[in-house]
Amino acid sequence: MPLAQLVNLWPEVAVVHEDPENGHGSPEEGGRHTSKDEVVVKEFPITHHVKEGSEKADQSDFVLLKVLGQGSFGKVFLVRKITPPDANQLYAMKVLKKATLKVRDRVRTKMERDILADVHHPFVVRLHYAFQTEGKLYLILDFLRGGDLFTRLSKEVMFTEEDVKFYLAELALGLDHLHSLGIIYRDLKPENILLDEEGHIKLTDFGLSKEAIDHEKKAYSFCGTVEYMAPEVVNRQGHSHSADWWSYGVLMFEMLTGSLPFQGKDRKETMTLILKAKLGMPQFLSNEAQSLLRALFKRNPTNRLGSAMEGAEEIKRQPFFSTIDWNKLFRREMSPPFKPAVTQADDTYYFDTEFTSRTPKDSPGIPPSAGAHQLFRGFSFVAPALVEEDAKKTSSPPVLSVPKTHSKNILFMDVYTVRETIGVGSYSVCKRCVHKGTNMEYAVKVIDKTKRDPSEEIEILRRYGQHPNIIALKDVYKEGNSIYVVTELMRGGELLDRILRQKFFSEREASSVLFTVCKTVENLHSQGVVHRDLKPSNILYVDESGDPESIRICDFGFAKQLRADNGLLMTPCYTANFVAPEVLKRQGYDEGCDIWSLGILLYTMLAGYTPFANGLGDTPEEILARIGSGKFTLRGGNWNTVSAAAKDLVSRMLHVDPHKRLTAKQVLQHEWITKRDALPQSQLNRQDVHLVKGAMAATYSALNSSKPTPLLQPIKSSILAQRRVKKLPSTTL
């Protein structure tokens, strides 16, 4: 569900109701809940209805897959639509029980439905359907798999002002669109900003939003989360759209510093700080960031940035946003700093397992009073795009080829049948398996977690497995000391196997293969990920077509993501600006190792044999000596007809100094890649496939058997130095 507050989806908000004309009520009174008898509610007029003739949806059009969250008023489910025009599409279904909603909450729910029906923006969650039964209300919304942006980043990623700028810019566009429709958001806080699978933001949860407010009018409700409230909301002087820009400043401050600008020991003190305290501006922030924050934290709302008729245009012109291309941002053409670790369409990795492990069940609702049903007249809704699709009788998309969802109580063997062994490694065994429900074939890697922790491998596959040339992760089961990692099945076999057995293979085809593999590696390197085991046996074909686009990079068991000392991931911007040179040097070494492995592959594709292993009689010491010398032949055999550009590229990818090798990006820019249509198409000769594969295996076996280089550390970290420190006499008098 695109609501991040999954433990308590609809929390009680301290609300003091007063006469809007005089705005009675003090900040101190805002710290308590009014009693049931004191509640005074105005019902808003219902102005939105579904056009007559539009086809409505009901709960029978959806299959429940998982519970995403649960609160006192209802549940949030992951659902799949089973009827056209959008059959098989996944949604989040928010189900509210009418009988448990107070009149005030019923009004807010209807208001949320009305607002969502009106809003169509790339950075605001979309309402697709709304309908009701006698006892319940249903909102069918975008299913956002990336989770809550701010708490997720605070737990996983180190980010910079440049990264914060991206999210704030998307948020500014979303808020500006709401304001242009006369909507005050009024509940801007970290939990209500979620990520989609690409890493773009979506504003969600409009239960406290106020509709139909123009710049001449004000709202007077005391609502929202107190730490993010603007002063005029706290003191009930009446508020307009400018209150959202104060909250926007609070979010900006929190993202840049990790703390809130105004936070007391309780609600009363927090409100007093908001009204009176001087802002302590951290001096490590850039001048541009400080300037924007000061312009947003104006206690007089008429002086606040964004309060004028221009709205967000004032904010967009700020020097802090000078590097943002607003048109590209709106079109989602700018790359987010962080991509969530999600795999298939129904992945709930970022949702609380307390809920996702439950069996999804929509219990019958108790019928409410007759007046409650009257309040929700006109609640039903079908998104216009869906009505148009249905009118055109658009054919249903193919059924998603993903396994059925499973709870933590279901075992791997309950879902899959295991077949023959595909491969055996030091810490794992790989087998073919068949999904019992769909009869589809997959591969399962069974890992002994007492020998190796596979969490990094699994996270990398979750985050990057949707790349077309990286093996796709389907499922993960954790049972005792065994972890079952289910992936797509590589039916086409190993890359080198196929090339060496191919009747005809040319230099031009070799360039196409390297381009596909290298663009995938470049994508990983740009995100701070190194594979570190790119031997040819880990590059396979997903099918028998032999098409370079069917190539998959597999086995990320030795892969690493660049992390800070505290274990958090680092965005590319953070890496470039704040990472120590020795860390970058190590990262460059690992990237160089990946390029060296691709150089070995390229040499073998062109020559028909490996560069450093000559035969079965070679010892590991001999192979390592040749590798260490950096010498290999580019004469004789196929090399007499291979292009000069190919020889140049091989030499630069196999340079003995890893820091002098080409980067993946530079390989992609080399003329042998960019001008491959001009390369020779004559057949390349090769040795017997078994001899070549044996030599390749011997090369990597020799590398793995070599002793690692000693890691130098400061003298003070040695055991001897530590022992000496303990023996030093005390000088304390």
Swiss-Prot record:
Residues that bear Phosphoserine: 221, 363, 380, 730
Modified-residue entries (Phosphothreonine), positions: 359, 571
InterPro entries (UniProt xref): AGC-kinase_C, Kinase-like_dom_sf, Pkinase_C, Prot_kinase_dom, Protein_kinase_ATP_BS, Ribosomal_S6_kinase_II, RSK_N, Ser/Thr_kinase_AS
PTM description: Autophosphorylated on Ser-380, as part of the activation process.
Family stated for the protein in its record: Belongs to the protein kinase superfamily. AGC Ser/Thr protein kinase family. S6 kinase subfamily.
EC top class named in words: transferase
Catalytic activity as recorded in UniProt: L-seryl-[protein] + ATP = O-phospho-L-seryl-[protein] + ADP + H(+); L-threonyl-[protein] + ATP = O-phospho-L-threonyl-[protein] + ADP + H(+)
Name of the protein: Ribosomal protein S6 kinase 2 alpha
Keywords in alphabetical order: ATP-binding, Kinase, Nucleotide-binding, Phosphoprotein, Repeat, Serine/threonine-protein kinase, Transferase
Listed cofactors: Mg(2+)
UniProt: ATP binding residues: 68-76, 94, 422-430, 445
Biological function: Serine/threonine kinase that may play a role in mediating the growth-factor and stress induced activation of transcription.
